[in-house]
From Swiss-Prot:
Upper classification of the organism: Bacteria, Pseudomonadati, Pseudomonadota, Alphaproteobacteria, Rhodobacterales
Catalytic activity, reaction form: UDP-N-acetyl-alpha-D-muramate + L-alanine + ATP = UDP-N-acetyl-alpha-D-muramoyl-L-alanine + ADP + phosphate + H(+)
Keyword presence, Ligase: yes
Domain of life of the native organism: Bacteria
Protein name (record): UDP-N-acetylmuramate--L-alanine ligase
One MF term in the entry's GO annotations: UDP-N-acetylmuramate-L-alanine ligase activity
Major location (coarse): cytoplasm
Family: Belongs to the MurCDEF family.
Protein's GO biological process: cell division; cell wall organization; peptidoglycan biosynthetic process; regulation of cell shape
Compartment list: Cytoplasm
Enzyme Commission numbers on file: 6.3.2.8
Organism listed in the record: Paracoccus denitrificans (strain Pd 1222)
Length: 475
């Protein structure tokens, strides 16, 4: 009997431990669409688990050994540790236990793939690639790290031959993904608790790109010095570069902003040789969101679209219709002329980029509210956090969202406030709770101002509740 070389059609129920996670849920949804029976557990129910249940998954609230039931295989994320009752029960029974990235890799082997990696911008870039391939008629399967507004989900199963996936570098598992086209947006020190050193992280990204087949393509942002250095080390594979710099194959030019909308042209410099030396230009492009970083992300998607044969007009129209992704500069409301934004940014590079985008989107003042995510991140990047809020007129820092970590001396909310002031910020303060945030906004915000809530923890709920809180008290 020949051994199976791809995911078998019959596995028995597939059990996900932590099915409500953004990465796990996308894989579960695609598996269900392919006809597999899916079940899973999470500590508590959520919109994500409710959606999966509506689609046909069996959902257990809480994690207990008996939840495994008749499962034939168990999928776990890196958040699931030894001692978890469901993991221990699966191993007691001798069931296959599969890491999330391993199951994603099995799905990817059924298709040709675009995998998007980078310290920042993965989710937005994944959404942009999906948007362009949709517009090009490719009908891609998509597994993303955020909810795509056009889908109402972080995943969809398409009938086409291409799959678009977000490749997470946080635990090194992205090197297991069999990418046909590999995108790298940027490389900054992050997730050092896994990598140990920046050199190890650099090596991880090089391995990710080097894994593409000989007929594949590496798509790299040469505006970022670490990525440009990576390009210099790549051999024997095709590379397309993108960015604002004059050497990029796909280059944004003539960029300006009007009412928070980016207007620009795209010079396809890498196609000059195919065009008798003339550089083709996609003129009159618009992207309905501010931020140079978002324009850069769009260039990565354009590089993929051109590689797959999409026409300039198709690309221009698709960019103009881009619907965005949840928690990436998401406008959650406006009260008395004050706009409230919810954003996932929690690394200093991301925070600086988001606040620059806020400046481009408003003529008023920018009020930043940040909840640091993990003591370890705040500690290791403390000086960067003290200087990344320069574009904000007012900075309010909430209590650190620990994500299960123990406090680290010198890396608290009050330490960061003191650090901001010491580094010259004119108006930095602590914010104690939602009520304090409401008082701050009433005290500081005027019509035309923008309140930007930043972080990967519970700050999103504060942002989404703020318009109603302000409206109720005003009534």
């Amino acid at each position: 009997m020949n051994a199976a070389t791809k995911l078998p059609g019959e596995l028995g129920p597939i059990h996900f431990v932590g099915i409500g996670g953004i990465g796990m849920s996308g894989i579960a949804e695609v598996l269900m669409t392919l006809g597999y029976q899916v079940q899973g557990s999470d500590a508590k129910r959520s919109k994500i688990t409710d959606r999966l249940q509506t689609l046909g998954a069996t959902i257990f609230e809480g994690q207990r050994a008996e939840n495994i039931g008749e499962a034939g295989v168990v999928v776990i994320s890196t958040a699931i540790k030894k001692g978890n009752p469901e993991l221990e029960e699966a191993r007691r029974r001798g069931l296959p236990v599969v890491r999330r990235a391993e199951m994603l890799a099995e799905l990817m082997r059924l298709k040709s793939n675009v995998a998007i990696a980078g310290t920042h911008g993965k989710t937005t870039t994944t959404t942009m690639v999906a948007t362009l391939l949709d517009a090009g008629g490719f009908d891609p399967t998509v597994i993303n790290g955020g909810v795509i507004h056009a889908y109402g989900s972080n995943a969809r199963a398409g009938a086409g031959e291409w799959m678009v996936v977000e490749a997470d570098e946080s635990d090194g598992s992205f090197n297991r993904l069999p990418a046909t086209i590999a995108i790298v947006t940027n490389i900054d020190p992050e997730h050092m608790e896994h990598w140990g050193s920046f050199d190890a992280l650099r090596k991880g990204f090089q391995d990710f790109v080097s894994n593409i087949p000989f007929y594949g393509l590496a798509v790299c942002c040469t505006d970022h010095p670490e990525v440009q250095s990576l390009v210099g080390r790549l051999t024997d594979r095709r590379v397309a570069t993108f960015g604002f710099n004059a050497q990029a194959d796909v280059r944004a030019i003539n960029l300006r902003y009007e009412n928070g909308v980016a207007h620009f042209d795209i010079a396809l410099q890498g196609e000059a040789e195919l065009n008798e030396g003339e550089v083709p230009v996609i003129e009159g492009c618009t992207l309905p969101m501010p931020g140079d970083h978002n324009v850069s992300n769009a260039l990565a998607a354009v590089a993929v679209a051109r590689h797959l044969g999409m026409k300039r007009a198709q690309i221009r129209e698709a960019l103009a219709r881009f619907g965005g992704v949840s928690r990436r500069f998401t406008r959650v409301g406006e009260v008395d002329g004050v706009t409230i934004i919810d954003d996932y940014g929690h690394h200093p590079v991301e925070i600086a980029a988001v606040l620059k985008a806020a400046r481009q989107a408003t003529k008023g003042r920018v009020i930043a509210v940040h909840q640091p995510h993990r003591y370890s991140r705040l500690s290791s990047l403390f000086d960067d956090f003290c200087t990344c809020f320069n574009e904000a007129d007012v900075v309010a820092i909430a209590e650190v969202y620990s994500a299960g970590e123990e406090p680290i001396p010198g890396a608290s909310r009050d330490d960061l406030v003191a650090g901001l002031i010491a580094h010259g910020h004119r108006h930095a303060r602590a914010v104690m709770d939602e009520g304090d945030l409401e008082r701050l906004v009433r005290e500081q915000a005027r019509p035309g101002d923008m309140v930007v809530c930043l972080g990967a923890g519970t700050i999103s709920a504060w942002a989404n509740n703020l318009p109603e809180r302000l409206t109720e008290k005003a009534a």
